[in-house]
């Protein structure tokens, strides 16, 4: 048994491995899936990305918090992660944009974290055994009946939590009501964006291209899409298992039947894949970072991309397949593991649709794939 006291914080994995550190952010108990992020920067964007909802994020970069927390870089209205794990938190925020420390931001939003653990050993453990359920415990959460809880009790609490496979999470992060992000300058196109966990930078990137974006709740019916008469339909990123997204999948099929130009990213790629009859599966430890290569097979070009996904669409590079909406093609894959990173419908009689598994809007990350928004613009103009 690891010896610990009330001044400790523990990260407990479902396989019984326990890491001891100190509290960081709020104290208490947090349960979720432990995943690791290899990005060296952009922790504020990571923490506020709705795709991380229900997950305990482990930072591989050894020092976190150097630039504090500002009022401009949030990708949603709040911190989305279930818990946070770092090696060496910065003792001081050093940025003219900072309004508070990372520690203060976590504490004010009730996010339970742990610092001072060997994140390198933890990441190797998750890489070899796969991501798994975990819990962060500190303060009163370390107690059971007034005494320090034994390790076995903490492990049992973790094992009682829900698994990510089969998790229906997008409903917890979608907007409760429709809203509009206006175009910058004169609006030239209108997009209906289905919010299953959309990041703030996505409608911002569209606005820069003269697109007015109507962000819609995940349960929006096709009748509302028809009322808007959009030039295009966008499927956002989001959390959870795509196998649970039956509503968005059915809506996507209705959009394809109406031949509305469609573009999807991340979770949206998985939704489109399911709408086209493809299966999805859970990756061993996922792709989470801002320097992940992707090959576009039509051009044999490589883009360095920002990614955050634990599930993927079934398929192989260059694979062609039949769908009710026209011939389909696996357009992009990751050279690291062959994972599908993009889909498209092809041919003059096919519905105009394509998607990618990565994040062309970055935030944080490289902008190699920003031209995909321009492709979407061209697809919409062709459909006018």
Show which residues each predicted segment covers.
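Intrinsically disordered, low-complexity, positively charged segments
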Residues: 3, 7-45, 50-52
